[in-house]
Amino acid sequence: MQSAKQKQNNLILYRRRMGFTQKQVASLLGQRDTSMISHYEHGRALPPLIVALRLEIVYRVPVAFLFPAMYEELKGRIRETEASATDRTINATQQ
């Protein structure tokens, strides 16, 4: 199940900035209809990596800009894990 942060994205914002309709984006992504575009935009589904990279190309912005809440959440978790790993390494070498 997705958290509220994971559902937040900027897909509609960047689609509109580019002046595209959902139908145009679906076509650029090689999809037959707009249903998955709508699901992605409203946070009902996360695009697979290949689709996320295609969106990055279509909208001309990094994937992190398209999904900023998810990016920040993941970055925070990784930084915490890095800090813990560094602390464990320092403690192990001091003993």
Identify what each model region corresponds to:
Residues R15, A26-S27, E56:
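The alpha-helix within a helix-turn-helix
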Residues G19-H39:
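Short alpha-helical DNA-recognition segment
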Residues M1-R17, N91-Q94:
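A short, Lys/Arg-rich alpha-helix, primarily the initiator
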Residues I57, A64-Q95:
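Short, charged recognition helix plus adjacent turn
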Residues S38-H39, I50, P68:
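Base-recognition residues in the alpha-helical recognition helix of bacterial helix-turn-helix
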Residues R16, G30, H42-R44, Y71:
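Residue-level detection of the helix-turn-helix DNA-binding "recognition helix"
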Residues I12, K23, L49, L53:
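Residues within the helices of the helix-turn-helix
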Residues G43-I57:
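Short, basic-rich loop-to-helix N-cap that marks the start of a DNA-contacting helix
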